[in-house]
Amino acid sequence: MVAILKRLGFSKLIVRWTAQFLRERKVRLKFNNITAEERVQLVGVPQGSPLSPVLSIIYTSGLLHQMKNWNNSSLGMYVDDGALFACAEEWADVDKLIRARYTVCEEWLRRSGLAIEPEKTELIYFQKQGVAFAMPAPTRLRLPMPSHSTYYEVIPSDCVRYLGFFIQRRLKWKTHVTIMCNRAKASAMALKLLGNTIRGLSMANWRLVLNAVCLPVLGYSCQLWYVPGKSKGLIKQTQMVQNLMVRMVAGAFRTAPCEPLTHITRMLPMEQYIEKLTHTSTLRLYRLPRMSQLLRRLGPDWYSPCPGDNALAVPDHLPSRGKSKQHPTVLEALARRVPSHGPKVDWTVIAPWEIPIWAAQTSHWGVTNPAARVEWVQSLVDIGLHSGVEVIFTAAKVTGRDLEGTRELIPVGGASVVSQRGSNDPSTWKWTMGSEATQFDVNAFALAKAVEVLASTYAAGVMPPPVIYIFSTDNSALQAIRNPRSIKAHAHCIRFHKALTTFFLTHRDVRIILAWSPKNDELRSDLLACTLAAEASQEFPPEGMDSVQSAAYQKGRAKARAFEQWERQYRHNRMQEEFRTTWLGTVIAPPRFCYQHAISDPPSIHHHPLWKEATSLTKKVAGQRRKPKYTRCTTSTALQLAVDHAFTGSYARRFRPADPPETHLCVCGPVLRDPAHLLTKCPLFHQQRVDAVIITNHRTLSLRQLFQSHPERLLAFLQAPGIARPPPNTSQQEWVEEEADTGIG
């Protein structure tokens, strides 16, 4: 290892440090807070060390150089996993090529003190789909084993696992998606230990846990297999698992319709979720280093060659026989989702070991009591009129403007800075940042410009005051701007860093305080800053409008598009349902009930009123932890009634036809025990309705009002015992089993 570092040109200091690090290694294993005895590590570095992957890459780098003259074959390495790839016209040539490349790798590893494990070696032959009279792939491959002067055979597999991907020989992704769905379903079923429909986690916590544990498994590697409009079968598989998750969150029966429950719980359907995930994951291209092989394969739009660089590894996409154009690769298809001129992150601007010279001279004052901070800022401004303290107010405004004449409002950001020092008139600056930016982007831009103003104002020998206050209404921007390696506002952080570095090179004794302060229209300077920012957001800069296309803006747009697609699907389904009901005479009872009473608006980024109230917490009390306002049993019953899949006679009549007809009736009389009767008419619960303010002035709230306008009254009513419970004439165990089939009861 030391010899390799010397040959690669590492400094003597790093070589000596690595040599000492690898010498006389001792290891202590820790598992479940139990630490084992210390033992000597004679060879290698144990897994888990942050330095292990770095040393592994350096040690095996020579193996990758072995393929620089290879043709029609390649070698890929990921720590201790390697993949040999070869292509040819005939299977015999493929076998010959693979065997030759394997021999080269085996010899290099053996000379380096490493070895290939034959029992872990896998083989797969890829074959095009739909090729007539295609020659079948070989049934085995013989590979040399020089250490034993023999060979071993590898049987080709129809599907192999590599780095978590299950790759099929015809590049079909059904096997991979099926395995991921089974894993997500198993995780969801294991989470049943956390509660059921009576007790346990609240609905909000159920959604949080399932989204954190199961959704990442369902969406793993979706960027490889998802094609908009062409992956319906795979999407359907993942949607079935999500339906289970939705029922677990809502505490619903296994027969409950999932579409309205998904609407109420605001869990994006899998098609929209995967579309959003695919788009947002593409934004990682902006964070890749300039020399990344991924960017090189995307061509000149993403990669700018420097003198001495090799030719771009971008193939000429010649059309296949019988086709007018070549399909893009997965990487190219992903890159087309985002603009190539977006905000890239340059990791080489600041060295990892560099400590800004201004770090010790700047402070951050975060969010506190708004009234107290406003009063303090007012007193600071009053004192500054006589003491010479400089106070700087930053403001930012995002205004929707029709820039292209298409009636589509595009957000345009404007920023301003107002500086007040002593009794002098305030100095003002304003800028138009550009279009397609978020409020956070403009706030960070305003802070960076404020520091640039400081650096330019006090550059020509002008002495600044000993303390300078910079105020902003966005605490997240204040926190991000102080981190020169921030990803959220990278460009603004670099400008902030360079300006402060320039400022403190000549003024080392000045202290700068970045403080949060709410908007205060009674303060002249603050009001002036807000006015100037609003004016800047309406102007056109002389050099033209810059398209910012920040990552935060693109994430927000991806989320908005996902909900727009969901809304279109919702309206399409309602039109189909109306057509079936009106012209075909088909009545789908559960959706008709919920869309008639509980759901009247299409899905949006806002929560359904019933969900918002059901997940609310108790009031904040000093020294006490906030708890869910309603019990799990109450919230589950509310959602069961919303879709008419509850312990009611209307549900039993549809799904329990073997029950006697009299069990469908209410105890109060010969009336069907449906949600409308239980919630608004049953005389047995009249007093509970009065207590929950469902009946006021001899007027009873309608079901629509209960589910959408006054869900707090519905939930207060359902907290009374005995409501929407199994009838006394029916075995409760049978009803519980119906619920238990969902895996949540």
What spans do the regions from the language model cover?
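RNase H catalytic domain
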Residues: G82-A88, K230-G233, V398-R401, L447-T531, ...
